[in-house]
Amino acid sequence: DVILHALECELNPIFQVMDLKGGCVHTKDDVIEQITKIFFYGAGCTSETSYVMRKALMKHFPKAEVEVDSDLLGAARAVCGYEPGIACILGTGANSCLYDGKKITQNIPPLGYILGDEGSGAVLGKLFLNGIFKGSLSEDIKEKYLKWSGLTYPQIIDKVYRQPLANRFLAGISLFIKENLKYYELRDLVIYNFQCFFEKNVLCYSSDSIRTLSAVGGVASAFEGELRACAEHFNYKIGKVIDAPIDGLIGYYSETV
């Protein structure tokens, strides 16, 4: 009776007017009739905004009991389960929280990739572009990236400052970095990004007894070795690291439902 499904498009109550018939969700009446519970976790689903998503889902799934929570709580449940810990999202963006095994007890605001999001793919991309164009990264890396991406300097500036979804473009550079970690400069860049994440976020949490950090996201899983090395530097242990929360959530709800 429990269906957990990742939508192919992002549904964010802050940035979208909710109309699930607008192409994001395709359903058949016979399937709708079988759904009795929906657990939805999404970015922007705070206590103030989650009613928008809940109302939209209830409209199209009238027989279902609907629970809407933040993507951060979903991540915490996926990687920590019922154990206390520090749970993180390290993907295109970054977020973190102190989790007591049931709920989020503290959250350092991530502030987005312009003001914050240390540890994220978008910030890693910013650091990389700064490095290749200002000269702190080698000319070899610069030439290799420009060939890999097929982009010129003006095109990159256009993507960052004029085109939509600049954060996704920046985060996409992580793929190049992952493929070229043989360059010590790039590994150092990844570690520096994680160090900033720890210094600006993890070390700010008030619990000295919780020293285990678990993470969800493509950046966390792609650079797990660097994340573990950074955590060890700050005297933290890394628990679970997964690319996407769905498997962890299935395990979580298998025990609760």
Describe the function of each predicted region:
Residues 41, 97, 178:
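Residues in well-ordered beta-strands of folded domains
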Residues 46-143:
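Phosphate-binding/catalytic loop of phosphoryl-transfer enzymes
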Residues 2, 41-47:
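Alpha-helical substrate-recognition element adjacent to the catalytic core
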